[in-house]
Each structure stands twice: as C-alpha cells, then as structure tokens.
Amino acid sequence: MLRRFFLCGAAAVLSGCDKLGTTASSNAPSFRAVDITGAEYARQLDLVDQNGQPRTLADFKGKVTVVYFGYTQCPDVCPTTMSELAQIKKSLGKEGDRLQAVFVTIDPERDTAAVLKAYMAGFDPSFVALRGTVAQVTAAAKEFKVFFAKAPGASDGSYTMDHTAGSFVFDAQGRVRLFVRYGAGIEPLTADLKTLLGSS
C-alpha cells in the first residue's frame, strides 16, 4: 500500500515541477523537501473545522502551515505524520506558535466533528482538522492533486482508505512552497520549516 502512496505523492509533485522553471530564483532558499513554489494548484481550501467554523487557506496567513490529507482510522501513515508535526512544533519552542498543522479528512463519513476534535487533541490542541461533504472533500483533494479511494477492509462492510502520503507546506504569506513526502524524516522537515519561519 505504501508503494502506491509514494507513487501518488510523486505524481502530485511532478505535476507541478514544470511550473517551477519560470518562477525559481537564483536567490531562492535551498529546501530538503520538494520545492513546488509557484505551483498552479493547492490554492484553495474551503471546508469546516472540528468546531464547526468555516475555514479557508486565508485563515492561516501569518503562520507557516502544513496541510495533510488523511483519516483518523489510518493505522500508520497519518498518526505518524501528525505525531511528527507535534514533535516539531514542540521542539521549536516559542517559534512553534507560528506553525500551524491542518488535517483534512478524506473519510468524512466516519470522521465526524467530534471524532476529529478528539483526534487532534491527541497530538496538539492547536492543530486544525477540516471536513466537508464527500463532494467537497473530493473537490479539495482534486485542487491539491491528492489521490484517495476506499479499499476493502478485513471484514465484510469495512474499509480503509488508499491516499497520497505527503504534506503541503505554505509560507506565512499563504503561498504553497513545499511537498514533503511521507518518511522524509523529522530533521529535514524541521530545517525547512525553520527556513520558512525565518523568512516570514
């Protein structure tokens, strides 16, 4: 399953790489993650958070924001990603107040507002979870070039979710800058986030 995740993540990145040639600068910072600055996607996100408040990407301007698409019943990739973000936020100390994690559920049928609220609280109370109707979530995933699909579970009627395993990083001005592949490691991501925090 992870192989599929990586392939989908790579496809999401490659689809934006051909946009970079016209926007890259010789003075641009060097990142460990994939630099997608200037990508013509991941520009809109219009869903509702775990407290029932409508949210858009504009709400997170002023902070370096990491957006991740996943689901709460994910057994490995999703909790690992959110746990790493919580560790990074804590390690940044006061600077961590300018880092915002946003979790977008791809399983709104099971991930109710209450479920998402409890899930985020298990990592960091400042983390935001977003949900919508299946149609709204599908539209959001399409905007970010994120793949997801139901997969049969171990028992009758149960299911898991196949999905792109990676995060999108926005700078404090609200511009998408990086795609971070799952498994990239805490240290490289921390370094990239510090670079963006330092330039904001």
What does each model-identified segment do?
Residues 1-44, 48, 196-200:
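N-terminal targeting signals for export/organelle localization
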Residues 58-79, 85:
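Short active-site neighborhood of thiol/selenol oxidoreductases, capturing the structured segment around
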Residues 42-43, 65, 164-166:
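Short loop/turn microsegments at loop-to-beta-strand junctions
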Residues 80-140:
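Structural microenvironment flanking redox-active thiols in thiol-disulfide oxidoreductases
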Residues 136-192:
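Thiol/disulfide oxidoreductase modules built on the thioredoxin-like
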Residues 45-65:
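A short beta-strand-turn-helix
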Residues 64, 71, 89-96, 123, ...:
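Sec/Tat-exported extracytoplasmic proteins
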Residues 16, 62-63, 183-186:
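A short acidic/small-residue loop/turn micro-motif
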